[in-house]
Amino acid sequence: MRHLVLRREGGVKFYAPDPEKYGGIYSAPVFYNPAMEKNRTLSTLLLKAYGKGGLVVCEPLSGTGVRGIRYAVESGVVGKLILNDISKEAVELIKKNLEINGVDAEVYNEDANVLLHKLKDSCDVVDIDPFGSPAPFIHGAFRALKEEGLICATATDTAVLVGRYPRKCLRRYGSVIVKTPFYIEVGLRNLLGYIARVAAAEDYKITPLMSYWEGHYFRVCAYAARGARDADDNFHHIAYIKYERGVRKILHAQSEGSSGPLWVGPLGDPLIINKMSEIGPYQDFLKILAEEYSISAPWFYRLPEFAAGGKSPTLKEAVGVLRAAGIYAVRTHMAPDGFKADGEYGEVLMAFKRYISSAHSLQ
């Protein structure tokens, strides 16, 4: 392949198409997005924190192969690496990048779903990192998984997941989404809800370890364990969310104006996130995730919802006000003016009203 540039990311070096020669990353013959470096770094940390050695790791949509190569080089837990891409040019590049990093892998040139079905019951980790939606590959990912393991998926079709394209959202994810101030979290829970329902259909129970939003994508990593009876537990965390005049409610059946079906359970595991924070970068981001995961409410609040006289407290002030009122509150990574709280809307509103009234009386 012509017009390659040598790049470095994490602990590896690799060749990727030169975007300047192809008019951008989306026109290159093999896709590589440098904006996904954080995604790859966090996923590598997650594998390392997961802590089980000798893992069979499959990346069926490999592109340049950098994600899988980073897993092999940096995590210390990969026993066997399986890389695949439907593009012959990508496969050639994957082999080149494996060689310069001294990494062994099985490399395939197949349709991703065909390969996943061939790998039935043989993988510890399946990482779906497509251009667009992971939905077409989730069934195959579970079929490739052993009795237990990790399922990871990235979705860049965020506009679909947050309900901006209702028909496509219904077709692709089987959900109806209504716009809310916390639409980012709804989109993330929409993706998790879809994965949980597919998991149940394939007789797997899932436990999210890390889920987050980053600008142009959603990312989910979940532990999965096979067992039909346990798989039913997924539905204990599937529900609908209704938003009306600030009030948020969980509903266990669809009603007019509700969004769902969504995952309303935990978005991740604070313990594994704290482990990740101890061994790698993005510590501030990971701290926010760990704090968010400790609050069960499947939504967040935004400062403008509680503004009085055109003014609202700063985020730091808001969190302090709520904690002083006995309501546990933390920042959210999903909005710069957002916070999660374990209180109902009315309780949060009343805490702010008391704070504003007190502030006025001191003037």
UniProtKB/Swiss-Prot annotation:
Pfam families in the record: TRM
What top-level class of enzyme does the UniProt entry assign?
Answer: transferase
Supply the PROSITE patterns for this chain: SAM_MT_TRM1
Record-annotated Trm1 methyltransferase domain positions: 5-352
Please give the Gene Ontology molecular function terms for this protein.
tRNA (guanine(26)-N2)-dimethyltransferase activity; tRNA binding
- Name the chemical reaction catalysed here: guanosine(26) in tRNA + 2 S-adenosyl-L-methionine = N(2)-dimethylguanosine(26) in tRNA + 2 S-adenosyl-L-homocysteine + 2 H(+)
Determine the domain of life of the protein's source: Archaea
Residues annotated to bind S-adenosyl-L-methionine? R40, R67, D85, D111, A112
Q: Which CDD domains match?
A: AdoMet_MTases (cd02440)
Instruction: Reply yes or no: does the keyword tRNA processing apply.
Output: yes
InterPro entries recorded for this chain?
SAM-dependent_MTases_sf (IPR029063), Trm1 (IPR002905), TRM1_arc_bac (IPR022923), tRNA_met_Trm1_C (IPR042296)
Mind listing the UniProt keywords for this protein, alphabetically?
A: Methyltransferase, RNA-binding, S-adenosyl-L-methionine, Transferase, tRNA processing, tRNA-binding
GO biological process assignments = tRNA N2-guanine methylation
What EC number(s) does its UniProt record assign? 2.1.1.216
Family per similarity comment: Belongs to the class I-like SAM-binding methyltransferase superfamily. Trm1 family.
Quote the function comment for this protein.
Dimethylates a single guanine residue at position 26 of a number of tRNAs using S-adenosyl-L-methionine as donor of the methyl groups.
HAMAP family noted in UniProt? tRNA_dimethyltr_TRM1
Give the protein name, as stated in the record.
tRNA (guanine(26)-N(2))-dimethyltransferase
